[in-house]
From Swiss-Prot:
Residue span of motif LXCXE motif: 24-28
GO CC annotations on file: host cell cytoplasm; host cell nucleus
GO biological process, one term: DNA-templated transcription
Protein name: Protein E7
Keyword vocabulary terms for this entry: Activator, DNA-binding, Early protein, G1/S host cell cycle checkpoint dysregulation by virus, Host cytoplasm, Host nucleus, Host-virus interaction, Inhibition of host innate immune response by virus, Inhibition of host interferon signaling pathway by virus, Interferon antiviral system evasion, Metal-binding, Modulation of host cell cycle by virus, Oncogene, Transcription, Transcription regulation, Viral immunoevasion, Zinc, Zinc-finger
Free-text description of this protein's post-translational modifications in UniProt: Highly phosphorylated.
Cellular localisation: Host cytoplasm; Host nucleus
Motif Nuclear export signal: positions: 70-78
Organism this protein belongs to: Human papillomavirus type 1
Top-level taxonomic group: Viruses
SUPFAM superfamilies per record: E7 C-terminal domain-like
Length: 93
C-alpha cells in the first residue's frame, strides 16, 4: 500500500496457496481400545482395607490390578461383596 489512504488498486484480489502440495493425511496407526488400555494402565499394587463382615475388624490385603479393576472392586465392596477375616473364616467352618 502506497500513501496514507488505501486505494482499490493496492488490494490483492488473488489468493495464492502458501504451501504447495501439502499432504494432510495422517499415516499414524491408532491401536484398538483394548490394547490402548493395557498401554495406559499397567497393573499396580493397591492396598485394600475393609472391615470383616462378621466381627468388624479391619482386614488388610494387597491386590495387583489396573485402575479400572480397582474401580470395579470398589463398586463390589460398596454393594454386595463382603470380606471375612481369617479368624472368622476358621470359626465358621
Amino acid at each position: 500500500m502506497v500513501g496514507e489512504m488505501p486505494a482499490l488498486k493496492d488490494l490483492v484480489l488473488q489468493l495464492e496457496p502458501s504451501v504447495l502440495d501439502l499432504d494432510l493425511y495422517c499415516y499414524e496407526e491408532v491401536p484398538p481400545d483394548d490394547i490402548e488400555e493395557e498401554l495406559v494402565s499397567p497393573q499396580q499394587p493397591y492396598a485394600v482395607v475393609a472391615s470383616c463382615a462378621y466381627c468388624e475388624k479391619l482386614v488388610r490385603l494387597t491386590v495387583l490390578a489396573d485402575h479400572s479393576a480397582i474401580r470395579q472392586l470398589e463398586e463390589l465392596l460398596l454393594r454386595s461383596l463382603n470380606i471375612v477375616c481369617p479368624l472368622c473364616t476358621l470359626q465358621r467352618q
